[in-house]
Amino acid sequence: MARFSTYIIFTSVLCQLTVTAASGTLKKVAGALDGSVTFTLNITEIKVDYVVWTFNTFFLAMVKKDGVTSQSSNKERIVFPDGLYSMKLSQLKKNDSGAYRAEIYSTSSQASLIQEYVLHVYKHLSRPKVTIDRQSNKNGTCVINLTCSTDQDGENVTYSWKAVGQGDNQFHDGATLSIAWRSGEKDQALTCMARNPVSNSFSTPVFPQKLCEDAATDLTSLRGILYILCFSAVLILFAVLLTIFHTTWIKKGKGCEEDKKRVDRHQEMPDLCPHLEENADYDTIPYTEKRRPEEDAPNTFYSTVQIPKVVKSPSSLPAKPLVPRSLSFENVI
């Protein structure tokens, strides 16, 4: 029977969500990641029958004076301390951010009272970083722009600077700080503070005198490096030009030497027999070399026989046959 009455009450509550009710002031609540937050209800003026809690229109719990009668699955994260109607949400996550609503029902009031909250879950801030954006040194005055930042930029983070060392402490709002320091002035410590609704964090102090001295040293070193680079570039360019000139000169020298040798060879080979080069016919008469024992004699006579080109008729030939005779060595020219 009790379970049936609870169901009837819960059904009536859902039906009354659409009814226009008196609303309280919207409250903003900030919670740290993995931390906890309490949505407080101050309802001492009226007699409360029950309170219904919702998150972005999702039902969370219904609380009566004698305890919780119905609750969603987040029982380990949602509690109602001291038996009151206020709700405590622990183990916060980023997706817990959103709108929370408490509807208060009383028999003494015809309309329900509504209290709304907006929860934002933030991370704890890390140590801020200080970077040098721009620096200059003119007329003995060193001007440096410092910028402070954290890993949680954009999550409702505000920045401020605190300067300690020159009389009273000075404060500057904003992430960027421009300072001017002259040689001989008293140094000061500059500290950046980053803050969000759940935490604040401080940077490591920086000192303008050291920054300016380091900047001057770096500038001198940079100039020295630039001079060295320029001198090296000039030397390299000179070496390249010298190599090109030397290579071109060697090639031209070899060409002139070859031309000179060619001319000298042409002059050393004169035309000794120009009359033989024109219409020169060369006849080669083959001959057969025969050796006989008589060739070894010390006194050998050679006869040159010229055979005339005479053609005799057959009638003039002698009738007696020719008898072969031995001849000495003959060379026919």
Curated annotation (Swiss-Prot):
Residues 246-333 are cytoplasmic. Disulfide bonds join C142-C212, C148-C192. Glycans are attached at N42, N95, N139, N145, N156. The chain crosses the membrane at residues 225-245. The keyword Transmembrane helix applies. Residues 27-112 form the Ig-like V-type domain. It is found in: Membrane. GO terms for cellular component: external side of plasma membrane; plasma membrane. The ITSMs (immunoreceptor tyrosine-based switch motifs) with the consensus sequence T-X-Y-X-X-[VI] present in SLAM family receptors have overlapping specificity for activating and inhibitory SH2 domain-containing binding partners. Especially they mediate the interaction with the SH2 domain of SH2D1A and SH2D1B. A 'three-pronged' mechanism is proposed involving threonine (position -2), phosphorylated tyrosine (position 0) and valine/isoleucine (position +3). CRACC:CRACC interaction between NK cells and resident Kupffer cells contribute to Poly I:C/D-GalN-induced fulminant hepatitis. This is SLAM family member 7. It comes from Mus musculus. The gene is Slamf7.
